[in-house]
C-alpha cells in the first residue's frame, strides 16, 4: 500500500471548492448533478448516489469555483452556459443558474487530437496562469476531465495542483496516481490525489470485472473474453485516433484482469472502444462476452449488452471522488488516497477486490 503522509490537519471548510479541467459532457453531468441533488435527504437511500453525505460533505457542499477549456464556444462563457455548449450532448437533468464562474483558457499541449481539431474551434485567448488561477479561486480539488490521450496536458495540470497545494482527481487514463514517481511527488508535496481513470457507477468495466470474478469464484475457467464499446460523444470520436488509445486499453484491461488469479494470453482478452456512432449522442453501448468451461469442461458462455448515458454514469462516482479528496486534504494527507482510488478508479496504485475496497472506503470516510 502506498504511504500516506499526514500533517496537522488544516481547519476544514464547510464546502468543497472544485475546479474543472475540460468542460465536456462529464463536467456537464457533474455540475447538473450537484443542482439535481441539492436538497437530497441524507437520511434516506437516494437513487443515483452511493453517498448523499460523504463524511461531513453533502452533495450541495460541492461548489464550482474555476474551470478551464480550450474550445472557443466555452472559454469566456459562464460555466452554466459552457456545459451545454459546443459538442456537449449528454442528457439534461437539471437547469443550472449562472455560476459567476467564467471558463478560462488553459494551455492546449496534447489535449486536442486530430478529430477534436477538425470539429471544434480553438479559443484565440491567451492561456492563463493555471497555478495562480487555482490559488485566487481558493480551490480545494482540481478534477481533470481532459480527453483520452492527453498525457502531457494531464501531467501539466497535475503539477499545477501540486504547485498550488490543491487535491487532484485524475478521471482519465493517464497514469499519475499509479506511477510511483508521480505518487512520490504528491506525497512529498503533501497533496492528495485520487486516480487513475474513473469507473462508472454501473458501466462496462465494473460489470465485466464482477462477472469475470464470479466465473472464477464459482469454479468456471474463464478462457477468453471481449468487451466492445460504441458511443456518440466526443470521447468516442477522439478515440478513433488509435494512437491516443494505448493507456485507455491498458487501464480497462487491467481493471478486469487484475481481479482474477490466472494470467491470460494477450489474444484471449480484448477490451476497448470500438467505434463512434454519432446518433447515440452521449449514450454508450457495451457488448461483452465471456467464454469459459464449467463442470466436466463443458462450455459455458455469457454475453450481454449494456446501454448507459455515459457521463451521468461517471458523475455518480466523481461526486464521491471529489469529496474523498477534500477529506484527505482536510486531514493533511499527501499522496494517493488508496481506499478512494481502489474503489472508484480503474487503475489505482493498488488493485483491491471490490468488497474490500468498498469497506476500506467506508472506514476512510469515518476516519
Curated annotation (Swiss-Prot):
**Something else known:** Was identified as a natural substrate of the M.tuberculosis proteasome.
Q: Which residues carry this modification: N-acetylserine?
A: 2
Q: What is the recorded post-translational modification?
A: Pupylated at Lys-73 by the prokaryotic ubiquitin-like protein Pup, which leads to its degradation by the proteasome.
Give the catalytic activity: D-glucose 6-phosphate = 1D-myo-inositol 3-phosphate
* Residues binding NAD(+), per UniProt: 78, 137, 157, 200, 235, 248
Give the family this protein belongs to, as stated in its UniProt record: Belongs to the myo-inositol 1-phosphate synthase family.
Cofactors: NAD(+)
Q: What is its EC number?
A: 5.5.1.4
* Annotated Pfam families: Inos-1-P_synth (PF01658)
The protein here is known as Inositol-3-phosphate synthase
Entry's Gene Ontology cellular component terms: cytosol
The lineage is:
Bacteria, Bacillati, Actinomycetota, Actinomycetes, Mycobacteriales
- What would you give as a GO molecular function for this chain, any one? inositol-3-phosphate synthase activity
Major enzyme class: isomerase
Could you tell me the keywords of this UniProt record? Acetylation, Inositol biosynthesis, Isomerase, Isopeptide bond, NAD, Ubl conjugation
GO BP annotations, alphabetical order? inositol biosynthetic process; phospholipid biosynthetic process
Q: Where is this cross-link: Isoglutamyl lysine isopeptide (Lys-Gln) (interchain with Q-Cter in protein Pup)?
A: 73
Q: Which InterPro entries match?
A: MIPS, Myo-inos-1-P_Synthase, Myo-inos-1-P_Synthase_actino, Myo-inos-1-P_Synthase_GAPDH, NAD(P)-bd_dom_sf
* Role, per record: Key enzyme in myo-inositol biosynthesis pathway that catalyzes the conversion of glucose 6-phosphate to 1D-myo-inositol 3-phosphate in a NAD-dependent manner.
Amino acid at each position: 500500500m502506498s504511504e500516506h503522509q499526514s500533517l496537522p490537519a488544516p481547519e476544514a471548510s464547510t464546502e468543497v471548492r472544485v475546479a474543472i479541467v475540460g468542460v465536456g459532457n462529464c463536467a456537464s453531468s457533474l455540475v447538473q448533478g450537484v443542482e439535481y441533488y441539492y436538497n437530497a435527504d441524507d437520511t434516506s437511500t437516494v437513487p443515483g448516489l452511493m453517498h448523499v453525505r460523504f463524511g461531513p460533505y453533502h452533495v450541495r457542499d460541492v461548489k464550482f469555483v474555476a474551470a478551464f477549456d480550450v474550445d472557443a464556444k466555452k472559454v469566456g462563457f459562464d460555466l452554466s452556459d459552457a456545459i451545454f455548449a459546443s459538442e456537449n450532448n449528454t442528457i439534461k437533468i437539471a437547469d443550472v443558474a449562472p455560476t459567476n464562474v467564467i471558463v478560462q483558457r488553459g494551455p492546449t499541449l496534447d489535449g486536442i487530437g486530430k478529430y477534436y481539431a477538425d470539429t471544434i474551434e480553438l479559443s484565440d485567448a491567451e492561456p492563463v496562469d493555471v497555478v495562480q488561477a487555482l490559488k485566487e479561486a481558493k480551490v480545494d480539488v482540481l478534477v481533470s476531465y481532459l480527453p483520452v490521450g492527453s498525457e502531457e496536458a494531464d501531467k501539466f495540470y497535475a503539477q499545477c495542483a501540486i504547485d498550488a497545494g490543491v487535491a487532484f482527481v485524475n478521471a482519465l487514463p493517464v497514469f499519475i496516481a499509479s506511477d510511483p514517481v508521480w505518487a512520490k511527488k504528491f506525497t512529498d508535496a503533501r497533496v492528495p490525489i485520487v486516480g487513475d481513470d474513473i469507473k462508472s457507477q454501473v458501466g462496462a468495466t465494473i460489470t465485466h470485472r464482477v462477472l469475470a470474478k464470479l466465473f472464477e469464484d464459482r469454479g468456471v475457467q474463464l478462457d477468453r473474453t471481449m468487451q466492445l464499446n460504441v458511443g456518440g460523444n466526443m470521447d468516442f470520436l477522439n478515440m478513433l485516433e488509435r494512437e491516443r488509445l494505448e493507456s485507455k486499453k491498458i487501464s480497462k484491461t487491467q481493471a478486469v484482469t487484475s481481479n482474477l488469479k490466472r494470467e491470460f494470453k494477450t489474444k484471449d482478452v480484448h477490451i476497448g472502444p470500438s467505434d463512434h456512432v454519432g446518433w447515440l449522442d452521449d449514450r454508450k453501448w457495451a457488448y461483452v462476452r465471456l467464454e469459459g468451461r464449467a463442470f466436466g469442461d463443458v462450455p459455458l458462455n455469457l454475453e450481454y449488452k449494456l446501454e448507459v448515458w455515459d457521463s451521468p454514469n461517471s458523475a455518480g462516482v466523481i461526486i464521491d471522488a471529489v469529496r474523498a479528496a477534500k477529506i484527505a486534504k482536510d486531514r493533511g494527507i499527501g499522496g494517493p488516497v488508496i481506499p478512494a482510488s481502489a474503489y472508484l478508479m480503474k487503475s489505482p496504485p493498488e488493485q483491491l477486490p471490490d468488497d474490500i475496497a468498498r469497506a476500506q472506503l467506508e472506514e476512510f470516510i469515518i476516519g
